Structure formats: structure tokens, C-alpha cells
Regions:
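Accessory carbohydrate-binding/adhesion or oligomerization-edge regions at the termini
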Residues: 1-40, 121-130, 195-197, 201, ...
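Acidic-aromatic substrate-binding/catalytic surfaces of carbohydrate-active enzymes
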Residues: 4-41, 617, 651-727
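Substrate-binding clefts and catalytic carboxylate motifs of secreted carbohydrate-active enzymes
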Residues: 6-14, 23, 29-31, 78, ...
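Accessory beta-strand-rich segments of carbohydrate-active enzymes
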Residues: 10-13, 27, 31, 51-160, ...
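Active-site-adjacent substrate/metal-binding segments within catalytic domains
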Residues: 31-62, 66-75, 79-86, 92-93, ...
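Beta-strand-rich binding/interaction modules
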Residues: 86, 172-210, 533-577, 589-590, ...
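Extended acidic/polar, glycine-enriched regions
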Residues: 111-115, 178-270, 597, 604, ...
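Substrate-binding/catalytic cleft of secreted carbohydrate-active enzymes
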Residues: 303, 309-312, 319-505, 509, ...
């Protein structure tokens, strides 16, 4: 937990003009300071973004360290310009760019005894116009503050400053280490152990540790070795290892240890072919995600990253993209759970100038280069790329040289066109000859995208072997809890992202639709008749997993008619035998029909992956509607006997009520105010609403009535509908 309380002064807006306390990391707006601005302010004539400045103070003691040790101060992210001072002295140059890790060597600025004073002056709007163009004229909320963690590191005078580890699927490991200080005569020792079991790997020569002499100060040392019995990392079996790097001085003493999680995997891009992971063509089922929380804005936590990654996996997705480098703990979750990631330099539509972009690319790539989940680099979004800097990604990713994309563009052999039509273009997508992967499609606003129409587009694109997958827009609703409006959740009208889950990660309709359509286990259309023998066709849409490694269960359910209000009863359950199918194959699954099968109403099937997680479930009627109704008609009559209903209109509200259910309408509008089932409120309100037509409610001609069997509210309208009759029995 990096959260600490700092002193804070805000220049404008809420709680401005006075020193107060603030939690760091945080976005200061969510802590009750400054002003809120949505990034599309420029669409409003004369509107300007909020531009307050925040001043932070924090007092700390110099950490225990050796005589020649160095002390570094790290910031994981500050919005937007950060001027850092220690004991009144500048720590270094002002940092510009909100989404990037930066650091200062502050050894010479610290006191040997007593408290040190850390001061950070943060400008919400950058003094660099290109930074504002890339980050702050954007379709998202504009926050300010030290919103990611701050920490100190103590390192020896001779130390590992940065290292690149390239672990390949064949067990080879290439490494490059950049040293600080005079490393001549020092030795670097590398060992690898399993993350789960802790067992050490051995090289082909049987060694558990590989040693390498180091070069002099400021130079990089590289070495290569090969390890045996390696389990590869992929999206369905994300095997991770821990690489341990020990720096030994001239006497053989260990003076520094660094550990990094790695995955042995090989990522390749081939024009007019596809993206390959460990030699297998990859189809990404992805989504765009911003770092967002209702209570923290752009400040999140490892727990929230885990929650989001698990929700994304639950939708049977395997890939994520965002418009800037995410919190590193989200990449850690992607590494652990098997999600591949497009790591993007920010640039909504505007771009960084060449000098600024070059610095930020280095900061981004050096932080993220060792994550196995990162498969592509992205230079900006929808025109926000500076092509002068394209080559720098491979400069800092010198071993893997991951492919660089320009999202929205057809660039360097990979067409990432956004929001394509079903029949997109001449010589593009299914009509084209290039690898295509829309980095935004199925816009989920108002649930008109997301899962809606996904099957039509996906099935069409899958007919082309150069289809590499795509990324739905967007993961969650981004509505922060406004500290200046009594805690209301604000999406800036219809501007803020509208996702497949709510702002607090509530699952919406598209969540389940996507989960079903992207399930790696698919059941072919199934109609249960009197000749059904328990067999049906299944397809394996995994990329690596054989279906024999999964499980499937069945349940036979007896379902009372909904008016009875009873839950379904399980008449029988058991295991389904799945065939051994390689990815892309279809075959027959089967189970033995239980004796009670004909007594059931619904067959439920549920599939589980190799780790026991539910992939998807399906329900199929054992009998169709008319036979079902005839069977339960007697139960309905019995269930309704003695039921009392009422209807009343008090001028303000119209209430239909039975023993178990009550529905309240607004007498002035005819819209539902609330629905109660027993003491439980059902979230069905503020309707009905006419779509595509006009309906004017007519209270004077509307009426309520009741008799011994039913309570009725007849709502009359002018326009597209004459009336809507609500009947409670």
C-alpha cells in the first residue's frame, strides 16, 4: 500500500487557496480539490479546460544505506507537469507526460540527519502544447495530481540500472544489462525458478545459475543461455517464471538482487499472414480499457486490476488495449492470467513533438519491455502518432523488436481500421490482402455495440485467414463520483465511455452476449425432440487447448411457470463426455439420458476450462411452449386460487398489487416508479419509453379497474401507440 497523507495546496476550484491534507496517490478532484473538466471541452464554444496547479509537501527521513549507496526517487505517474524539489533544491528537469514512470537520483540532496522535505509542483495543463494535444484534448476525463505511487530505492554505487530479458519459447534467454558505476571486475549471476512451484530451471549443461563478467561503467553487457524443460507462456496456459539477477562485487559478495517475472514465449508478425504466438496464429478477442475507478478517477489498485482482468477473462477475451501505458500492476495481471496487451504511447488525436515523444517512448518501453503479455507497441491513436519516432520502439526493445502499429491506420502490413462497416471497403478486410485487426469496433454506447451484432461481424471476418482479431470499445462506464456535486456519478452526458460493465463493474447485457459468442467451446444448434439420445455437436475454438482438457456437465431442470414464483428444481445432473478435439475441430459430445429426462423442462449444459473455471453455459428447452403451457396449466389455476389483487389511483400514484407483487406507476406520466416482489425491489423503473416514435400519455382517458381475478391499469396514448394494458393476476 503506497498511500500516504501529504500536505497540499490547490490554486483554483474546490478547497483552493489554503494548505490542507491529501492522500497520495490520488487525482486531486476526487479528493475534493480543483475543478472537473471533460476532455471534449473544445466542442463547446469558448470553453477552456481547468488549469489549476497543485503543490505537494512530504517530510521523510533518509533511509538507512551504505556510504557509497545511491538513493533514487521514483514517480509512477503525475498529471501533468511535475517540478520536483528536495530540501529546496531541484531534483532534476521538470517532467512532462502523465502516464510514464520517471526518477531522480537525490543522494546529494538529502540530509544525513533530520527530516527531508519533498516538494512537488504539479501543473494540470502542461507548458508543452504537444503534451496537451496528445493527452488533454481527448475523449476522457482530465484529472490532475500525483495519481500513481511514489517511492524511494536504495542502490549500491555499482548497480544494475536497467535490464532486458528476452525469454523465448525454445528455452533460450537473451539478456542485456545496463550498469551504473564502475562495474569492472563485477559478476552478474542469473537463475530462474518456477513462480508456482519454486523449482529451479537448469541450463542444457545442467547448471542452475549462469554467471557473466560485466563491462565498465555506462555500458551494456549482453549474454545468452538456454534452459531445459521450459513450459511456454501462452494465453491459455500462462506459465510464469522468476528470473533472479545477482550482482556480485570483486570479492564475490552479493551487493544487489533484482527479480523479474518472465514468460518463455515467442511473438512474431508476418505480413500477409498474421500474428503468431509460439508458432501458432493468434486471433485476439480483445477490449479497450482505461485505468478508471469511480472513487479514484485515474488512480486504481492491484485489487482493481485483478478484478478487471478476471472480468475480461470471464467474457472469454484474451487481449486488452488502452490509450496509454496502464498501471504496471494491470500488466502483471495480464501476465498471470493470460491476456495479451497492446502497449500504447498516448496520443488521442494529437501527437507529442519529436523530442518529447522520444523521451516518453523510452520511459514506456523500458518499464514494460519484459512483460510477456505485451505483444505489440502502439504509437498513438487515430492520427496521434509521430512517425519520426516509429523506429525508437525497436531501439529500446532491441531483442524482440515487437511490431509497431498506428491504430485506425493501415500501416506496415497491419490494417487496424476503426469501426468498420460489415462490408468495409474495396481491397480491405475480407476483401483485402493484408492482415487486419480493428483496434476499435463494436462501440458499446447504449449497448448498440458490444455483444450486439458481434456474431455477424466476427463470423464474416473469420472467413479470411488474415483476420487477426479485434478490440471492442469499451470495457467500463467512466463516471467518477463528483466531490463537488454531492457524490453524483457523472458521465458528462453521453460523452464519457459507455462500456460493457458499469462504473462499479456491474455486468450489463453485452457482458453475457460477448461471453457466449466468444466462448472457446461452442455448441452447434440443438433442438431436443423425442429422438434426442444425449449426443450433440461441439466445436473447439481454443487456440492451444485440446477439448479433452475441459469438462462439461448437464442438469435436467423442472421449471414451474413464472407466475408460481418458484425456483427451478434439478431432476438429474451428471458429466458430459467431451471428444478429444484439437483447436478448430468439431465432434460429438454425449451423455446418458437419465430416467427423469422426459419429466424435465430444460436441459442446462455448462463447460469448464482446465482450471475449473466456468467458460459458458447454455439452456435448451426439452419441450416447446405449447406442451409446456398445457402441462403447467393446472398448476397455474391451483396457484392462483385465493389470490387477492387490488388497483388504486390516488392522483399521484397508480398501484397494482397482489399478495406477492406490487407495481407503482406515476399517475402524471404513466411510467413505472418501482416494482416490489415481496420486500425486494426489482430494478425496473422509468419506462416504458418510446423508441423511434412519439407517444403522448393521456391521463384523462387512462383508467384502473379490478375484479376477483385481476387488477388492470390501461394507459392511453396519442401517437405511435393507442394504449398499453398492465394486468396483474
Amino acid at each position: 500500500d503506497y498511500t500516504r497523507t501529504w500536505e497540499f495546496y490547490c490554486s483554483k476550484g474546490q478547497n483552493s487557496g489554503k494548505w490542507k491534507s491529501i492522500e497520495v496517490p490520488s487525482c486531486w478532484e476526487l479528493q475534493g480539490f480543483g475543478e472537473y473538466t471533460y476532455g471534449r471541452y473544445y466542442t463547446i464554444k469558448g470553453a477552456k479546460p481547468s488549469d489549476e496547479t497543485g503543490i505537494y509537501r512530504y517530510r521523510f527521513l533518509t533511509p538507512d544505506c551504505g556510504k557509497n549507496d545511491r538513493i533514487k526517487l521514483f514517480f509512477d505517474g503525475v498529471m501533468t507537469d511535475a517540478e520536483v524539489r528536495v530540501n529546496g533544491n531541484p531534483a532534476g528537469q521538470i517532467h512532462q507526460g502523465a502516464f510514464y514512470r520517471f526518477s531522480y537520483d537525490i543522494t546529494s540532496l538529502l540530509k544525513a540527519e533530520g527530516e527531508n522535505l519533498l516538494e512537488v509542483k504539479v501543473a494540470k495543463q502542461s507548458a508543452n502544447k504537444s503534451v496537451n494535444a496528445a493527452e488533454r484534448r481527448a475523449d476522457w476525463w482530465l484529472y490532475g495530481g500525483i495519481y500513481r505511487p511514489v517511492w524511494l530505492e536504495v542502490v549500491p554505487d555499482v548497480s544494475m540500472e536497467h535490464f532486458i530479458l528476452d525469454a523465448r519459447a525454445d528455452g533460450s534467454l537473451r539478456a542485456s544489462v545496463r550498469m551504473a558505476g564502475n562495474a569492472e571486475g563485477h559478476v552478474l549471476a542469473v537463475s530462474i525458478r518456477g513462480l508456482k512451484d519454486g523449482k529451479p530451471l537448469r541450463t542444457l549443461q545442467g547448471k542452475e545459475q549462469v554467471s557473466c563478467p560485466l563491462a565498465t561503467s555506462g555500458r551494456e553487457t549482453g549474454f545468452t543461455c538456454k534452459w531445459s524443460d521450459v513450459k511456454v507462456w501462452n494465453i491459455e496456459a500462462p506459465e510464469l517464471y522468476v528470473a533472479r539477477l545477482e550482482l556480485k562485487d570483486r570479492s564475490g559478495n552479493v551487493i544487489q538482487v533484482r527479480e523479474e517475472r518472465i514468460g518463455f514465449r515467442t511473438i512474431e508478425f508476418f505480413p500477409q499472414d498474421g500474428i503468431y504466438l509460439n508458432g501458432t496464429r493468434l486471433i485476439v478477442k480483445g477490449i479497450n480499457r482505461h485505468s478508471f475507478s469511480v472513487d479514484g478517477g485515474r488512480t486504481t489498485s492491484a485489487a482493481m486490476s485483478r478484478q478487471d482482468a478476471l472480468l475480461i477473462k470471464e467474457m472469454n477475451m484474451n487481449a486488452v488495449r488502452s490509450h496509454y501505458p496502464p498501471d504496471e500492476h494491470f500488466l502483471d495481471m495480464c501476465d498471470s492470467l493470460g491476456l495479451v496487451y497492446i502497449d500504447e504511447l498516448s496520443g488521442w488525436h494529437g501527437r507529442y513533438d519529436t523530442e518529447t515523444g522520444a523521451r516518453l517512448i523510452r520511459e514506456m518501453v523500458e518499464r514494460d519491455v519484459n512483460h510477456p503479455s505485451v505483444i505489440l507497441w502502439s504509437n498513438g491513436n487515430e492520427g496521434g502518432w509521430n512517425t519520426d519516432n516509429d523506429s525508437l520502439f525497436c531501439k529500446y526493445d532491441k531483442f524482440q523488436r515487437r511490431h509497431v502499429i498506428h491504430p485506425w491506420a493501415d500501416f506496415d502490413g497491419l490494417d487496424t481500421h476503426h469501426y468498420p462497416a460489415y462490408l468495409t471497403g474495396v481491397a480491405r478486410f475480407t476483401n483485402g490482402y493484408k492482415v487486419f485487426m480493428p483496434t476499435e469496433f463494436m462501440h458499446a454506447m447504449y449497448d448498440q455495440g458490444g455483444g450486439a451484432g458481434l456474431r455477424d461481424f466476427w463470423d464474416r471476418w473469420m472467413t479470411n485467414p488474415m483476420f487477426a482479431g479485434g478490440f471492442i470499445w469499451v470495457f467500463c462506464d467512466e463516471a467518477p463520483k463528483r466531490s463537488d456535486r454531492g457524490g453524483v456519478l457523472d458521465s458528462d452526458g453521453s460523452n464519457a465511455p459507455d462500456g460493457v460493465v458499469g462504473p462499479r463493474r456491474e455486468k450489463e447485457g453485452s457482458f453475457y452476449a460477448i461471453r457466449s459468442q466468444w466462448s472457446p467451446v461452442q455448441i452447434k444448434p440443438l433442438l431436443i425432440t423425442e429422438h434426442f439420445d444425449g449426443s450433440f455437436f461441439v466445436s473447439n475454438e481454443y487456440i492451444y487447448t485440446n477439448l479433452k482438457d475441459c469438462r462439461m456437465t448437464y442438469e435436467v431442470l423442472s421449471c414451474d411457470i413464472p407466475m408460481q414464483g418458484a425456483v427451478s428444481r434439478i431432476l438429474a445432473r451428471g458429466e458430459v463426455t467431451l471428444p478429444a478435439l484439437s483447436p478448430g475441430e468439431t465432434g460429438k459430445a454425449r451423455f446418458s439420458l437419465p430416467a427423469s429426462f422426459a419429466e424435465g423442462d430444460v436441459l442446462k449444459l455448462e463447460a469448464f476450462d482446465r482450471d475449473g473455471h466456468c467458460i459458458c453455459d447454455w439452456s435448451f428447452p426439452i419441450r416447446l411452449a405449447n406442451p409446456y403451457f398445457q402441462r403447467h396449466l393446472a398448476q397455474v389455476s391451483t396457484g392462483l386460487s385465493g389470490n387477492t389483487v387490488s388497483a388504486r389511483n390516488n392522483g399521484k400514484e397508480i398501484v397494482l398489487k397482489s399478495e406477492k407483487v406490487s407495481v407503482t406507476f406515476d399517475a402524471a406520466t404513466g411510467m413505472i416508479l418501482r416494482v416490489l416482489s415481496g420486500n425486494t425491489e426489482i430494478p425496473l423503473t422509468n419506462g416504458p419509453v418510446a423508441v423511434g416514435m412519439k407517444m403522448l400519455y393521456q391521463p384523462a382517458s387512462s383508467y384502473v379497474r379490478q375484479d376477483s381475478e385481476e387488477a388492470v391499469f390501461c394507459a392511453r396514448y396519442k401517437g405511435g401507440a393507442d394504449s398499453i394494458v398492465w394486468r396483474l393476476t
